[in-house]
Amino acid sequence: MAKGDPKKPKGKMSAYAFFVQTCREEHKKKNPEVPVNFAEFSKKCSERWKTMSSKEKSKFDEMAKADKVRYDREMKDYGPAKGGKKKKDPNAPKRPPSGFFLFCSEFRPKIKSTNPGISIGDVAKKLGEMWNNLSDNEKQPYVTKAAKLKEKYEKDVADYKSKGKFDGAKGPAKVARKKVEEEEEEEEEEEEEEEEEEDE
């Protein structure tokens, strides 16, 4: 069982694990009053397993295969409920950028064009250095614009909540939404890198 999640399926067992389990059950039946010395017991099981033929092991191999099927099926059922990364509603208002992100949006393409093949991390580092070298007056236009976008975002969120969630468009719109989501995720990856640079 996984810690903190009692609903997570029990892990799949190997053929050897089934063999050890069987040995333990046999020991309990033959010696119900004798406690198991796990170190000694494990050693005996290991030695016995090594001397067994493939035919003798086949029963445990089959048990392991059946358990893998059980595990895969349960994990498939468990997966969607687990949640993972929550799917975004494409109609939900996108969080507004900070002044630093607006600055990054303006200068990121310039850095990429002058440094072909530069990594996201290095772009973020350069942008962070450039931002930190700006005076408060130079930063002000970006900060002011960010504040206005935040006001608009808060209004849009209120409107969005009052109207309820989207009704789920079908067909080509879904494909377009997927492309937008992928582009947004790529942008967010760059923004996360840049956010780290801003905090340094």
Curated annotation (Swiss-Prot):
It comes from the Eukaryota. Keywords: Acetylation, Chromosome, Cytoplasm, Disulfide bond, DNA-binding, Immunity, Innate immunity, Nucleus, Oxidation, Phosphoprotein, Repeat, Transcription, Transcription regulation. Residues 71-97, 161-200 are annotated as: Disordered. Residues 9-79, 93-161 bind DNA. Signal peptide: none annotated. Disulfide bonds join 23-45. Gene3D superfamilies: High mobility group box domain (1.10.30.10). Expressed in bone marrow cells, specifically in primitive Lin-, c-kit+, Sca-1+, IL-7Ralpha- cells, and Ter119+ erythroid cells. Residues 182-200 have a biased composition (Acidic residues). One of its GO terms (molecular function) is DNA binding. This is High mobility group protein B3. It comes from Mus musculus (Mouse).
